Amino acid sequence: MIKKNNESWLIVGLGNPGKEYERTRHNAGFRAIDVLADRLGCKIDRLKFQGLYSQVNYEGKKVFLLKPQTFMNLSGRSILQLSAYFNIPPQRIIVLFDDISLPPGRLRIRADGSAGGHNGIKSIIAEIGSQAFPRIKIGVGAKPHPEQDLADWVLSSFSSKEEKDLCSALNRSAEAALCIIDHGVPEAANRFNGSTP
């Protein structure tokens, strides 16, 4: 039983469910985990834990991929349910999400930290009671005008140039998630932080 727990990981992509949100900045996490699922040859299509999830074996480890279906601000509920059910500690919950402080195409990997104003991360910290989970931040670009509403910005689409840069970042974020499992956060951060399209 203990061995199984030692080999279980949860990788989460944050976003909002629904066609109208699919290509928005706030859904970079959903898109990143779809890229990862393709790479691992699985589909994230099992409905449970207030989310869509998949289970796959990777390098002898049990890996769960999750897309919470709660809408962004309640993402933590879905993550808490799955991680509690399968007994996965925060240190083995990797979260992929959008970051407006990074330009499109850039990644930043951290072992832990505060929510930094991101409501999805805020929800996770509140629900699981810990900040000590690895995260992969995917750059989606800052608001072009300071007075622009943040919600409007994160729910906007990418320009074609930004989309191209984002696609590169999505591929690298999938690699980075597996690198964290294989080699740990410091190695993944060293390899992918600051990498450009």
PLM region descriptions:
Residues 1-112, 122-137, 143-151, 156, ...:
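Nucleotide and nucleotide-moiety/phosphate-recognizing core
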Residues 117-120:
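Hydrophobic alpha-helical segments within soluble ligand-binding/sensing domains
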